[in-house]
């Protein structure tokens, strides 16, 4: 099959933080997906995650993604070669990856994890305050 004709099967396991936890196990059990996708983020969620990180720097991600959703399907995902895509890392994607790696190690499951970073603007705020630019320059 050429790349042009390749079919990619994507299963949407969640649409928001707090969505039902039954989707991921059902999709994985079906064996009919190549990618399992979790969407956790919305403006309110980001605010909650930022508050959690302020209290405990290792937090700031959707903990249930690791402790509930992935723990339930991790072995099967690996066995079936399903790739997982998620934005559950919130304001601490590396913390989410570290927590997931710890669960994988605990379960004895080999796991490769990629992390996308670069959109955290909080470190820029002190410099912006010092520069005191007019609002129109920040747009």
Language-model segment annotations:
Residues 2-132, 137:
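Metallocofactor- and cofactor-centric catalytic cores in central/energy metabolism, strongly enriched
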